[in-house]
Amino acid sequence: MRKTVLVLLALGCGIGIGGSAYGTTKGLSQIVTPDLQSAGDLSLSFQAQNMKIGNPYELQGELGLTKWAEVAVFKGFKPNELIFGTEFGLLQKEPWLLSAGFVSWSPHSHIDPQPYLEAGYWSEHHKVIVGAIHVGYRNEAILGYAYDFNKKWRAQVDFQSGSGNSSTLGITWNITDDFQMNPALYVTNDKPHDILGYVVFTYTFHLWNKEKARDNEKAGAE
C-alpha cells in the first residue's frame, strides 16, 4: 500500500477511477500494493488529478501501525469527502508478499468499502503485483509492475479491469529519502480511451521509527 504509492497511502495502493480503488501514497499510480508502510512512518501527500479519475484535489495520510498493519485517510475537496482504507500483511517475507484490506470507504458519500486481496513478488529491482478487488456487485482484476533503477527512480505500470478504471504509466522520483513525486498518465478502459493526468507529492515523517530516520540521514550525508 506504499507509494507510492498509499498511497498514501491506500492515513497509497493510485490507490482509483470513478470511485474504484485509490492508490496509496507509496504504491503505484492507481492500485494498492502489497508492501506495507513501515511501523511508525506517517506519509502525507497532496494529489492532483483529472476529474474523470476522481476527486481533483486530495490530501492523503498513511500511517504504519505495526509491521503487519497500516491505515489510510484521503480528504477530497470536490466533492467534500473523507475516504478510508486499511491493509494487513498476511505474508511479508520478501520477495513474497500477500496482503488484504479495503479501500474507498466513504461514509459521507455512502460508498461501501471495497475489499481486496493482493500477492506480490518484491525483488531489488522488479516488483510484480497480482490481485482482485470487489467493487459493488463485481470483482475486478488488479495487475501491476514496477522497475526500480536505483533508490531515486522507478518506472511503473498498472491496470485495473472494469468500467471506470484505467491502465497507467508513471514514474516515481525520490527527490530525497523522505520526499517523492509520482506523475502518471491514465488511459481509460472505457472508449474513447481518454488520456488523463495525475501527480502526487509525498513527504514521510518517522514518528516512532527513529532508527530508519537516522539511516536516511546517514545515506543523505554520503
Language-model-derived ranges and their functions:
Residues M1-T4:
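Positively charged n-region of N-terminal signal peptides that target proteins for export
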